[in-house]
Amino acid sequence: MRTLIKGGTIVTAEQEYVGDILVDGDVIRAMGTHLDEAADRVIDAKGKYVFPGGVDQHTHFSALCNVGNRDTAGYETTDSAIVGGTTTIVDFAPQDPDRGLLDSIDYRINVRAKDKSCVDFALHSMVTYIMDSIFDEIEEFPRRGISSIKIFMAYNGSPLHVDDGTFFRILEKSRQVGATVFVHAENGEILNFLRSECVKKGQLTPHYHYVSLPPFTEAEAVRRAIYLAGQTDTPLYIAHMTCREAIAELQKAKGTGQRVSGETFTHYLTTTKEVLDNPDFNEAAKFVCSPALRDREDCEALWQALSDGLLTAVSSDHCGIDVAELKQAGRNDFTQIPNGSPGAGDRLHMVWTEGVCTGKLTRQKFVDVIATQPAKINGIYPRKGTLAVGSDADVVIFDPNYEGTVHLADNPNGVDYNLYEGRRQSGRVETVLLRGQVVVENAKFVGRYGQGKFIPANMYASGYENRN
C-alpha cells in the first residue's frame, strides 16, 4: 500500500517546509516538494501541519491502582491516545508480586497488551519488589529490548520504595548494560511524616494533598538522585518535574556536564494547585497526582525550561482511574485517594493550545518535546519520533484552524472524566497513520484493536551521548 501525503506543512524538530511524503508499506519512502509518485491513496494536507506521531514516554495502562486490587484502564483504551496523535507509548512494566522483572515484562507484552493495544509500545522496567535477582535480570535488558528502568525514592513503607543503597546498585548495574535510570524523586520519609501530621490534625480534604507534598521534598530528592548518579556516571532521567526548586537543581547539574535530564507532564504545565480547593470532592479528586500540582510561577518556569531545552519531554502520566468508584476510597481521607488521571489523548492538543498558540513554544520545539526527544531518550529513534526516509510511517495531520472545547464524549478514554473538560482547544488531530495505515480519520478511530506492537529499544540511548 502506497500513500502520498500532498502539500502539507511538514514540521520536524529540525525544519519546517511545505512538501509531500510518500509512504510505502510501513515506512516513509520519500520526502520532498512536488513528489510525483504513483500511490494507492492520496491525502490532501494543504493548510494542515504534518507532524511525526507523538511518543508519550510515561504512561500507566493496565496497572494495579491499589484499591480493591483493581487495575487502571487497559490497553484497549489506547484508542484515545492515538486519536490524540500519540502513535507510540513507553509504558511501565511494574514488577508483579509473584514475578521478576523479565517475567513481568513478558506478561505485559504477551497478555496485558496483546490483541488490545492500538498504539505501538516500548517498555520501561520498574522495580517494585527488591530482591538480589533483579541485578542479574538487568543484565538481560539488551536482549529484551528494554533500555530503561524506573525506581521510586518516595512511597516509604510500600514495595515501590527503593532505598539509597539499592538505588546506587541499580545505577551501577544500569551503567554496565547501557540502560537509563528514570527516577521518581520525592523525599518519601518526609512526605510520610507530613501526611501523618495532616491526618492527626483532621486535615483530610484534597487541599492537604498539596500541603503534604511541598516542593522542597521534590527538590531535595532531585539533588540527591543527581549526586548518586554522578558517582556512577550513569545517565539519569528525572520523571515528572514540577517546581522551580527542582529545575534549579537540574540546571546546576547540567552546567557541570552531568548526564541528566528531565520531563514534565501536561497537567503541570496547564493546571495549578487551586483546583484541589474545589469543595466538590469529585472535582478535586480528579487532580490528585504525585508530585502534587504547583502554583502559576512553577507552570511558567516549566514552560521556560522546555523552551530552553533544560526539560526535554512532555508526557501525560496517563493513569485511567475513575472518580465514581475508585477515587471514592479517599472521600474522607485524602491519603487514600488513588493518585493519577487520564491524559494520553489530550497531550498534543493541550501543549499546542497552551504552548504554541501562546508563543511559549515554537512549532519545532513542540515536535521535539512531544515526539523526537522521547524517542531518543528511550532508544527508539529514528524508527519513531521523526519524519525521515526509512522511519516508520507514523504521521499526524493536524488542523491548526480548529477551535473548540475539550469534551470526554469526543474522545472517550475508558474512565468517567476528562481532566481538561470544558477547556479551550485550538487545533485538532485530523488524520493519523500508524506504520502506513490510516487509523484515525476525521478525528475518529478507524483502526483495529491489537494493531499496536512491541518496539524493542536500543541500549545506550541519548543519555549516553557526549556530555552537555
Model-derived regions, located:
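Histidine-rich, glycine-flanked metal-binding segment
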Residues: M1-P52
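Divalent metal-coordination and catalytic microenvironments
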Residues: G8, I21, D26, G47, ...
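Metal-associated gating/positioning segment near the N- to mid-region
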Residues: A45-K116, S133
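Short catalytic-loop micro-motif centered on adjacent basic/acidic residues
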Residues: V90-D91, A122-S125, P235-H240
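Alpha-helix-loop-beta-strand connector modules within alpha/beta enzyme cores
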Residues: L102-V119, F168-V183
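Histidine/acidic residue-rich metal-binding segments in metalloenzymes
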Residues: S133-V314, G330
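His/Asp/Glu-enriched, well-ordered alpha-helical/loop segment
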Residues: L204-D233, K286-F287, D308, T312-V314, ...
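C-terminal cap of metal-dependent C-N hydrolases
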Residues: Q328-D333, N339, V389-I455
